A protein has these predicted regions:
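Short beta-strand-loop/turn "lid" adjacent to the catalytic site in phosphate-handling enzymes
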Residues: 59-106, 111-124, 141, 286-290
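Glycine-rich phosphate-binding loop of actin/hexokinase-like ATP-binding domains
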Residues: 124-196, 289-290, 296-302, 306-311
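Short glycine-aspartate micro-motif
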Residues: 9-13, 65-69, 105, 131, ...
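ATP-binding/phosphotransfer module of carbohydrate and carboxylate kinases, centering on a glycine-rich
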Residues: 1-60, 64, 181-336
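Active-site nucleophile and cofactor-binding loops and adjacent substrate-binding regions
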Residues: 40-42, 83-87, 105-112, 131-134, ...
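A short secondary-structure junction signal
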Residues: 117, 151-155, 210
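Residues on a specific face of well-ordered alpha-helices
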Residues: 50, 93, 109-112, 146, ...
Length: 336
C-alpha cells in the first residue's frame, strides 16, 4: 500500500465482544476514507496492544501511522480507561510509548459514535418516526450491544460538542407490572439493577432467564445449548428464534426487550431534550429492525405522561453503519 502522500490515522472501536480497527486516509479536501478495516473477537488477545500489533504487522503500515484514536466502552479519565466488559486497562501514555505515534487519543465509544453522525448519509440511517429534526437541537445517542452506552451531542452556535456518559449504569425503572417482576428477579441476583442489566446482549439473556425461571415459560432448547457454551452466545440465538417466530419464550423476551429499549431511549431523549434527534447505535438495533418497527418501541418511547408530545416530536433514527464509531474515532484524531 502506497503511503507516500497520505496522512494515515489508525482508529479503533473497542467493545466487549469485538474490536474494530481501521486505517483512514485523510486529505485536506477529501473526506475520511477507510482503507484497511478489520474486526477481531475482543477476547482473542490478552490486551488491546496485542490486537493493534498484529493488525499493523499484517498490513505492514506501522511506520506510516501519524495519529491514532480509540473509542472504548468505559469511562475515560485523564487519558486512561478500564474497559467495562473486558479485563483491560488502556492508557494513551502506554500506547504512545509502545508504538511511538506522535498523537494518541482515547475517547468513550459513544463519543466516537456521536462524532460520526454528521458524516452519515441517508442510507446509513433508518427513521422510526416522521418527526423532523431541529437543526439547533441537541442529539442523543443510545447504543445497546455487549453493554449499554449513552451520549449527548450538545449543539450551540456553529459547534457540536459530544458529551460522554455512563448512563447505562443508572437504575432500571420498571414501566409496568411485568417489568416490576423482572426487576425483583434481577434484584435478587445483582442487588443494583442497572439499565444495562436489561438493555444489552446480556440483558436479553437476563429477560429470557426471568421468563424461564420466574414466569414458568417453556425454555428453548437452542438457547439452553448456547448457554452451556457461554452466556454471550445466547443473545443471538434468542434473537434469531424470535425473529423467525420459532419459539414463544424468545419472542416474548425480545418483545419485553424492545419495550424497555423504547422507554429507556425516551427517558434519555427527554433528559437531554434531544430535539435534533435520537440515534440508536450499537450492535443490536440493526439486527432487530423488524421488531423495532412494529410500534412497541415508539409506544414506549412516547409514554412520558405530560411530556409525551414533547418526545413524540423528536426524530428517532437507527444507525445502520456498523463502522460509525470507527469513523467517529478517526474524525476525532483528525480534529485533535
Amino acid at each position: 500500500m502506497s503511503t507516500t502522500h497520505d496522512n494515515l490515522i489508525l482508529a479503533g472501536d473497542i467493545g466487549g465482544t469485538k474490536v474494530n480497527l481501521g486505517v483512514f486516509r485523510a486529505g485536506k479536501t477529501k473526506p475520511l476514507t477507510v482503507i484497511r478495516p478489520e474486526t477481531f473477537p475482543s477476547r482473542s488477545a490478552p490486551d488491546l496492544e496485542t490486537h493493534i500489533e498484529q493488525f499493523l504487522d499484517r498490513h505492514h503500515i506501522a511506520q506510516a501511522i501519524k495519529s491514532a484514536c480509540f473509542g472504548l466502552a468505559g469511562p475515560v479519565i485523564k487519558g486512561r480507561a478500564k474497559a467495562t466488559n473486558l479485563p483491560w486497562i488502556v492508557s494513551e501514555t502506554n500506547l504512545q510509548k509502545r508504538f511511538g505515534w506522535p498523537k494518541v487519543k482515547l475517547i468513550n465509544d459513544l463519543v466516537a459514535t456521536a462524532l460520526a453522525i454528521p458524516l452519515l448519509n441517508s442510507t446509513a440511517l433508518l427513521a422510526l418516526n416522521r418527526a423532523r429534526a431541529d437543526r439547533q437541537g441537541h442529539l442523543a445517542v443510545v447504543a445497546p450491544g455487549t453493554g449499554l452506552g449513552k451520549a449527548l451531542v450538545a449543539v450551540g452556535t456553529n459547534q457540536m460538542v459530544p458529551v460522554a456518559s455512563e448512563g447505562g449504569h443508572v437504575g432500571f425503572a420498571p414501566a409496568n407490572q411485568a417489568q416490576v417482576r423482572l426487576w425483583r428477579f434481577l434484584h435478587q441476583l445483582f442487588g443494583h439493577v442497572s439499565q444495562e442489566r436489561v438493555l444489552s446482549g446480556t440483558g436479553l439473556v437476563n429477560i429470557y432467564a426471568w421468563l424461564r425461571d420466574a414466569e414458568a415459560m417453556e425454555p428453548a432448547a437452542a438457547v439452553e445449548k448456547a448457554l452451556e457454551t457461554a452466556e454471550y452466545n445466547a443473545a443471538p440465538t434468542i434473537t434469531e428464534k424470535a425473529l423467525a417466530h420459532q419459539d414463544t419464550i424468545c419472542q416474548r423476551a425480545l418483545t419485553v426487550f424492545v419495550e424497555i429499549f423504547g422507554a429507556i431511549a425516551g427517558d434519555w431523549a427527554l433528559s437531554t431534550m434531544a430535539r435534533g434527534g435520537v440515534f440508536l447505535g450499537g450492535g443490536i438495533p440493526p439486527k432487530i429492525l423488524p421488531v423495532l418497527r412494529t410500534g412497541d418501541f415508539m409506544t414506549a418511547f412516547c409514554a412520558k405522561g405530560r411530556f409525551s408530545k414533547v418526545v413524540a416530536n423528536m426524530p428517532v433514527r437507527v444507525i445502520l453503519n456498523d463502522r460509525a464509531a470507527l469513523l467517529g474515532a478517526a474524525r476525532y484524531a483528525l480534529m485533535s
